[in-house]
Amino acid sequence: MRCLLSLILFSATVAAAQQPDPDQLFSSAVDAQQRGDYDVAIRDYQKLLQLQPKMGDARANLGAALAHTGRLDEAIAEYKQALETAPDKNAVRMNLGLAYYKKGDLADASHEFEDLQKLKPQDVQLAILLGDSEVRLGRGNDAVQMLTPLEAQNANNADFEYVLGTALIQAGARREGAAKLEQVAKATQMADAYLLAGSTYMDLNEFEKSRIDLEEALKLNPKLPRIYTLTGMARDRTGDPVAAEPAFREAIRLNPDDFEANLYLGAILYKRRDVDAAKPYLDKALQIDPKSSMALYENAMWRSTAGQYDEAARELETVIKSDPDWLEPHVQLATVYYKLHRPEDGAKERAIVEKIRADQQSKGPGK
């Protein structure tokens, strides 16, 4: 019995001697984290937390190391646990919000940032993160209300102005938002800002401004999504189809299923009377979006030129049903009816054309 007891005591002594020192583990983990050796840092923090599971700083640091390696779900779990014992809970909540943000869980990120922003209403980085989260959640009005009081002291902060500009556009103040994005783009040469400003001006039918911004975006970053399509549209709408054509061809090379690039290129070739070359692009556009009024209209124009008047009439009638106030389909349908020897139908369409024109003159420029 005495021999067995001594063996038990000896085993306990050896185990105690082999137990890692928590201070050394913490120091080793911090050193590894600071030099970017996150795998070692994670290993040492995990060992330490097996010994001292309520050590909040270590758990928060483990969350940060996991986040750096892209293990965001694990990082989030560690941050949540760290909130129970960490001395600086606000710092942990900030990191938790950032982990949600990087993961794309914007609702939870916004919740964390919003609570922190109430405690630190002048913190510009926090405001930027919250504002961007709100915009990406479709809550542009909320972002504008939160950011606007901070603008005076942050007007030279490009990130702040970019987020405010995107929020304004989403909230309906599109010209003001686009102007802010232009200022950011000129100051920072940020291609994304030029792209969003240019596409916004296009939506506002301000095509010259749109083209200037989109051309700059294309120069800065030709890999931006849809940049060739948008630039081609701006060139075409400023009366430069020759310059638009290569942009659309490049867009189709990058994405053969680009609806607008196929539609616009087909229309350019049709207007040039290169009808055989136009047909595959117009067909492709209609295949991509069979319900598109524009695609149906352009195909109807091709059919009319090719002498396929019955098919052209059917497509124009479909367009008019979906958009009865669009003038040009009525004009073309009247012409097609006369070619089909349907003068009564042609006369009815002519009367509709005159009515739409009169309405447009009373209201201002229309479609």
Language-model segments: which ranges?
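Helix-start (N-cap) detector for alpha-helical repeat units in TPR-like alpha-solenoids
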Residues: 22-23, 56-57, 90-91, 124-125, ...
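Alpha-helical segment of the N-proximal tetratricopeptide repeat
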Residues: 21-47, 51, 64, 68, ...
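Position-specific recognition of the canonical hydrophobic site in helix A of tetratricopeptide repeat
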Residues: 33, 60, 64-67, 94, ...
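Structural marker of alpha-solenoid helical repeat scaffolds
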Residues: 51, 85, 119, 152-153, ...
